[in-house]
Amino acid sequence: MVFKQLVDDDLGCASYLIGDEAAGEAVVVDPAYAIEPYLEAAEDEGLRIVRVLETHTHADHVSGHGRFALEYGLPVAIHPLAEPEYPSGPIEDGDEVLVGSIPIRVLHTPGHRPEHCCFLVEGHLLTGDSLMIGDAARPDLAVEAREGAEDLFRSLERLAGLPDETEIDPGHTGGSLCGASLSRERVSTLRMEKLSNHALAIEDVQEFVAHSTGIAAPRPPTVERVVDLNRGPFLAAQPPLELLDSVQGQLLDVRPAREHAAGHAHGAINIPLEGGSVGTKAGFVLDHATPVTIHARSPEEAADAARRLYAVGLLDVAGYAMGLESSEHLEPVGIDELERLVAADSVEVVDVREKDERDEGYIPGSRHIPYRLIRAFRDELDNGRPVVTVCSSGARAGVAASVLAAEGVDARPVLDGGIDNWQERGNQVTAFRRCGSG
């Protein structure tokens, strides 16, 4: 059997190619919108892809099943509770789907979504968005969170009854918004998860509900849009990008942060390709109702950025531009300068990390606004004082500062390092103290 995991690092999504070498046939499980990697992997193994299997209707990324169906005539199979608007072959609990002579067993495992299924094939358990490595999937993207958590608890109980040596092949890795505490490991075993995964160790349903609903990751703002696209009629490939003479709609600058800071066009929002998670960040800070022009260093980088936007349902990309007039600048702040500015109380420091990160320690007097919410606080921050944005590495701080600057706020990012570097230099941080912590 050919078994290959393919990971989209930008979104933390994992897909799988399963093939029977003797028959020369393969299936793809949970394909991403960009289907070329699966075609290349199949060709490398001398296989022909004959079917697409979906564990569920994805809420965080656009599936490639429509492209496989429209471009290659492949059938798509999903549980009927997904209520797809496209032609599909329904799969039910206990069914076996053959790839050549290899049976893939279907296990209905609701929780993340009502239609969710896992696939068991020759000791591999493709868990989709159910049992993850280090945690379980979030239960709040399709139904009321408590209902989803109760279903997920029962599904995990079922999976825990499989042999301990079963390999766990998840649908997501760390960096995905489909779970709160996911490991960046890509493969595990059921035995290892029983030893290390707190979600799998919980034996009481109410305790599990409290665990699952109390630490949910931020809800992607594109959820409804992406679900509609994945449930709706097959989505074809987007047309090639056009080189534009002028900016249409909003401007997304995907060049490195320091290039953007040194000079950029008016109104540009900077989400560098090199920083990763471009689609996720764009979903939070771009206006979904306005076309996007991509400012890139090359046509190839523009196409890469567009692919990442399409993957989260942002399909209205007008085209790309290169060499735009650099009429505006951002002035980055180093940690040493930040020390002086804070001591003089001459800036407003905005911590753009998530709450769990900030609770571990933050700059005294700093304000907390996660980067994904920064636009909503624009008016409160435009008060005559310069704003300095800070995170853990500089990546989110740069995005947040560019959003504020595009809105006319005097904003400067800490691009090199963040809170850890501040603390390493002997500066004070304040940590959130939980009850009973000392």
Regions found by a protein language model. Name each.
Residues 1-48, 118-128, 133-134:
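Conserved beta-strand hairpin/beta-sheet module of binuclear metal-dependent hydrolase folds
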Residues 3-6, 16-17, 96-121, 125, ...:
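Core dinuclear metal-dependent hydrolase active-site scaffold
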Residues 18, 30, 56, 68, ...:
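Divalent metal-coordination and catalytic microenvironments
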Residues 24, 103, 113-218:
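Metallo-beta-lactamase
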Residues 28-29, 48-58, 77-81, 108-111, ...:
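Active-site neighborhood of phospho(di)ester-bond hydrolases with catalytic His/Asp-centered motifs
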Residues 33-77:
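Active-site metal-binding motif and surrounding structural segment of the metallo-beta-lactamase
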Residues 77-80, 85-95:
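Glycine/small-residue-rich loop that forms an oxyanion/phosphate-binding "nest" at active or ligand-binding sites
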Residues 138, 142, 191-228, 232-235, ...:
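Rhodanese-like catalytic fold shared by cysteine-dependent sulfurtransferases
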